[in-house]
């Protein structure tokens, strides 16, 4: 069996459990999925966004989260995204044979978003998005950038996300999550030309 076949045949899946004084979360991610999502965080809009992310990235995602929502949504939303980042990192393993970098433009009605990712192991995150409302559903719009940061830093990858224009905050955030799913899908694909090697001149990610 060739090296690249080994990479393709390995199930790229991870389950993360996080229990703190604020949250209790179990998250399972399959990179090479079919877009199936079963997300229950107690935050309806976050459930919607993660379901769209999985669908557009063709990831399989299951999330069960209980948190101190009687205070606010911050701890639960943040910890879910911490778990998602860690699951991405663990599921990718050594990241051998992956495309590594990719980007995606996604429109949602009047809004347009761009997300670019580099799975090179160097965590960084830049989010440029202006929102006109304080909340969309149960999620504060001031949390959106922090959620992407939580995924990127715990996933050990570089993420740049920009809402290029738009009026409706729901549409802007939805375009961001869809673009993130599609960019990550493209970056995690196996490139047979790499022959199962690490996509870096350093030889390690």
Swiss-Prot record:
One of its GO terms (molecular function) is imidazoleglycerol-phosphate dehydratase activity. Belongs to the imidazoleglycerol-phosphate dehydratase family. GO terms for cellular component: cytoplasm. The keyword GTP-binding does not apply. Keywords: Amino-acid biosynthesis, Cytoplasm, Histidine biosynthesis, Lyase. Gene3D superfamilies: Imidazole glycerol phosphate dehydratase, domain 1. Its EC number is 4.2.1.19. The keyword Cytoplasm applies. Pathway: Amino-acid biosynthesis; L-histidine biosynthesis; L-histidine from 5-phospho-alpha-D-ribose 1-diphosphate: step 6/9. It comes from the Bacteria. This is Imidazoleglycerol-phosphate dehydratase. The gene is hisB. GO terms for biological process: L-histidine biosynthetic process. It comes from Chloroflexus aurantiacus (strain ATCC 29366 / DSM 635 / J-10-fl). Its main location: cytoplasm. It catalyses: D-erythro-1-(imidazol-4-yl)glycerol 3-phosphate = 3-(imidazol-4-yl)-2-oxopropyl phosphate + H2O.
